[in-house]
Amino acid sequence: MTRLLQPFVLVVTALLAAAYAYPAARLATGPWERGALAIPFVLIWIVPALYWTGSRDDEESWLDQAAHQASYLSMAWVSFLLVLTLARDILLFAASVLQSERTHAVIAQAGAPAVLVASLLAMACGAATALRGPRVEKIAVRVPGLHPDLQGFRIVQISDLHVGRSIRRGYVERTVERARNLAPDLVALTGDMVDGPVERLAPHVAPLAALAEGGRAFFVLGNHDCYSGADAWIAHWRETGVRVLQNEHVVLRRGAATLLVGGVVDPAYRARRPEISLQDAPSADFRLLLAHNPKLAPLGARAGFDLQLSGHTHGGQFFPWTL
């Protein structure tokens, strides 16, 4: 339990406690209801709190796996519950300001059950979406004046797999199979591939090596890759044939056209400056930047890149988690 005393863990645990306590206090009206509702909320909060502060001696045990799944489901639920509770309270405040007693009474009476049901449904939908596996989304990027030999160039981007206790080898195999079926000219691995050390997760990410055939797969670090041991993972990806870009670039040829692929590291590992990746770069018909964090886009554009591929946001988030 020494991890509990670490400042970061203390802060996260306190924030979790507040996130669970606020809905529990606001959704119950009387003291008996508050007490009855507080018990399950405390129990649900304890699961992730103990999981994140406990031992990591046996991460593959069924008990650890169960605690892991329960903790993430718990936090997913409270992320919806907290936002919906805040929305309900804003509506109550608006009804009070407008002196609409009827509206206030309806929201006060029906709001709590509606919030609980809606948050559980949202969590269930999210879990079902995750269990379905990777989804292919095809996006056509139209580039005025693109060199004819680069027309139809196909890039497959894979990002934020977070291979670890939840995402295992089977999920990675399905991802690789779908990627190969798309017949890509280039594979962009834009960070956060793992959540754990090489010695534990190497067998689970092994299928990704199949995408490196012909030197077409490129990888840039994400923040979670850095937390998981950046140097060890960089060495591992290079051993598999994946080309790791750390504030550097490579130039590919397709017919008479040239494609420059630049990559920047995540700030969790080292300074991120897209212009560094263009140092001593020749002219190219198209410049592609791989960066885990999309906030680098303005810097990338100023540096002279035509397109940036990023991850980090998991396909988009909802307020206030976008702050």
PLM region descriptions:
Residues 122, 139, 259:
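A broad, low-specificity signal marking well-ordered, structured residues that form hydrophobic/aromatic
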Residues 1-134:
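Non-catalytic terminal accessory segments
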Residues 133-145:
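Alpha-helical transmembrane signal-anchor/signal-peptide segments
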Residues 142-323:
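Soluble catalytic domains of enzymes that build or remodel membrane lipids, polysaccharides, and related
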